[in-house]
């Protein structure tokens, strides 16, 4: 979303903040990987990055976050998790930023944008996982897609649908963003 005090330096600082959050939030659930899989902690800062800074920044931060986190901390594992997450989160950031810049900044449109970004990201994740499985000689059945993209992540999906619009609304009221 475009802000009145938008500047290249401010955008870089905010992008770095969202990237740092994508590194740190998974550490909250790091001791129990199943909880991390359920809550999807890296998704929150990337979706917010797209909403706040726009599609190009959301795409870049979303793509970089899981790959850099894998290299620096060893989690998520690079193949196939971090690679597929890079494409998924890039789609989250790009779609949320691109759509939000083209709609009225109302609560219903925030939800519509968020839902579209979440669906697009999950579809991209499934497509990349399918391709990576084929390249490695394994399979990625539709049941695995449903389990990974939907059933396991229900708590994270609900949390995103509740928290992201609240955060965006709070940032608007504080005039941090338009």
Would you name each region that the model predicts?
Residues 24-40, 64-99, 133-135:
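Interfacial aromatic-anchored transmembrane helix boundaries in multi-pass membrane proteins
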Residues 31-36, 74-83, 103-178:
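Membrane-embedded alpha-helical hairpins and interfacial helices in multi-pass inner-membrane proteins
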Residues 12-17, 44, 48, 59-63, ...:
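Hydrophobic alpha-helical transmembrane segments
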Residues 43, 47, 86-93, 157, ...:
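Alpha-helical transmembrane segments of multi-pass membrane proteins
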Residues 1-52, 56-57, 92-101, 164, 168:
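Hydrophobic transmembrane alpha-helices
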């Amino acid at each position: 979303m475009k802000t009145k005090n938008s500047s290249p330096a401010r955008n870089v600082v905010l992008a770095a903040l969202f990237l740092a959050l994508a590194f740190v939030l998974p550490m909250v659930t790091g001791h129990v990987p199943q909880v991390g899989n359920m809550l999807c902690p890296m998704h929150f800062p990337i979706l917010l990055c797209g909403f706040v800074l726009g599609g190009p920044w959301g795409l870049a931060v979303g793509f970089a976050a899981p790959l850099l986190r894998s290299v620096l901390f060893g989690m998520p594992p690079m193949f196939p998790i971090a690679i597929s997450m890079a494409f998924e989160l890039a789609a989250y950031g790009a779609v949320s930023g691109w759509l939000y810049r083209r709609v009225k900044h109302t609560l219903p449109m925030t939800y519509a944008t968020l839902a579209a970004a979440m669906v697009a990201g999950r579809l991209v994740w499934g497509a990349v996982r399918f391709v990576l499985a084929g390249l490695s000689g394994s399979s990625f059945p539709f049941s695995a897609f449903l389990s990974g993209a939907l059933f396991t992540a229900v708590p994270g999906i609900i949390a995103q649908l509740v928290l992201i619009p609240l955060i965006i609304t709070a940032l608007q009221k504080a005039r941090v963003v338009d």
